[in-house]
Amino acid sequence: MPIKKIESVRKRDGTVAPYDEQKIAEAIAKAARASGLDNGTIGRDLASVVTMYLERYHERETPTSQEIQQLVEKILFDTGNAPIARAYIVYREFKDVNEFMRELKPMLKGGVRV
């Protein structure tokens, strides 16, 4: 199977934006920090896995933002990072960081499992 470079992403509103691995890394790192499991490189490390997967296995050249988010969740769970995956899922739902933290704290304290 030929490897293709992922150059763009189709956003929820239908517009196409440049693919930015750094945005994925930052989102993973934020979730890792929120879950208390940030090792300083997990965002970059797993974002590169997401990019490699997309380049090798994605059927279309332009993945959607939803497909990328689902892939991030899968990779987080598959690599044994379920607490980070849970934080990432919650984080996706909130644009406001303060609202995100208010929702996340009870989950982390209560040991909620997905």
Annotate each predicted stretch with a short phrase:
Residues 1-114:
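Extended catalytic cores of very large enzyme megasubunits
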